[in-house]
Amino acid sequence: MAQQYKFVFTAEQAASEGVTDHKKLPKLIRKARNLVKAPSKVGAVGRASSGRFYLGVNVEFKGLLPHFSIHAEQFLIANLALNSEPKLTHLAVSDNGTVFQDPCYDCTRFLKEINNAHQIEILIKNAHGRDGSFKSLESHMPDEFGSESILSAEPSLLLMERDNCLALIDEDSAAGGISSNADLCSFLKLEALKAANKSYAPYRKCPSGVALFCEGEVYAGWYIETVDRTISLGPVQAALVDFIARGEGKGFDKITGAVLVEKKDAKVGQEDTARKLLEKIAAPNCDFKVFHCQEERKDWITGAVLVEKKDAKEGQEGKLLEKIAAPNCDFKVSHCDEELKDWIKL
């Protein structure tokens, strides 16, 4: 059963399928499309810098508007993030297994957020082409659509390791549990918080994470946004990517518990969207809870001492504490020297 629902291939496993390099990506597209349960079957195959290969599929939710759906490329990006892959090098997308086209506008926005976007190569192949050719993502979308000019000089972009330094708000810590199971609720809450701390939300500063519970397993995902405020992947959708990739074909109606962690006054709240989606697809008795978080405060630091050499070439006395510590933090600097050893005699 696990092999039937395989979304990640090591280099050795891919080679056994005939995929020995990025030029052979089409050989995995059939497997990706076979995993699609939606009427329109779009598959995506990507090669990561680790040498592993990842699959993505489009996911549609019956009875919900298209903006709830997950594009194959978005699924692939979330799959990379869930597996801590730092870079995507090559990508192939097809809705029929023969023609390979550029990603759609929305998905290109997501791809441009990846830290090595300028290095990503896209397979282009028409119905009559034998092998097709790869072209850079940069040639598909001009520089003005990138995120480099929006973020700081040293941006932390999508797929790079993140820690949003979020902590649960005390008043939420004692909130009611899922199905009267306080231990399960606490565990899901912590898993959702972990996900929120990995959330990619550099523009609107509204990180969030979701943890889903199904038959003893927990699946998690986090909010991913783009510079375009109308294009993002919700935390429930990201958690569903984890569920689909690791759930070995389980139906969404088996999900019996869910926890969302987000900032209390987030500019982009996820609760309404998450609730609507889960009410439509999860088990009728699925218990959905929301907990709030905030950035951890550092202003409890009221005193600090630095010890360093007096004439150190690279002194450590800086202004970091002024930014994070209490306004009245007492900061002292003491100097040291190497101890003389020439008094030691045999």
From Swiss-Prot:
Co-factor note (free text): Binds 1 zinc ion per subunit.
Catalytic activity: cytidine + H2O + H(+) = uridine + NH4(+); 2'-deoxycytidine + H2O + H(+) = 2'-deoxyuridine + NH4(+)
Binding of Zn(2+), residues: H71, C104, C107
Gene Ontology, cellular component aspect: cytoplasm
Residues annotated as domain CMP/dCMP-type deaminase: 20-148, 183-304
Signal peptide limits: none
Top-level division of the source organism's lineage: Eukaryota
Classification via SUPFAM superfamilies: Cytidine deaminase-like
Coiled coil: none
Cofactor: Zn(2+)
Known EC number: 3.5.4.5
Residue numbers binding substrate: N58, V59, E60
Entries under Gene3D superfamilies matching the protein: Cytidine Deaminase, domain 2 (3.40.140.10)
Single GO BP term: cytidine deamination
Alphabetic keyword roster: Hydrolase, Metal-binding, Zinc
Active site: E73 (proton donor)
GO molecular function, a single term: zinc ion binding
Role: This enzyme scavenges exogenous and endogenous cytidine and 2'-deoxycytidine for UMP synthesis.
PANTHER family: CYTIDINE DEAMINASE (PTHR11644:SF2)
Similarity section: Belongs to the cytidine and deoxycytidylate deaminase family.
Subunit details: Homodimer.
Protein name listed in UniProt: Cytidine deaminase 5
Organism name: Arabidopsis thaliana (Mouse-ear cress)
Gene this protein is translated from: CDA5
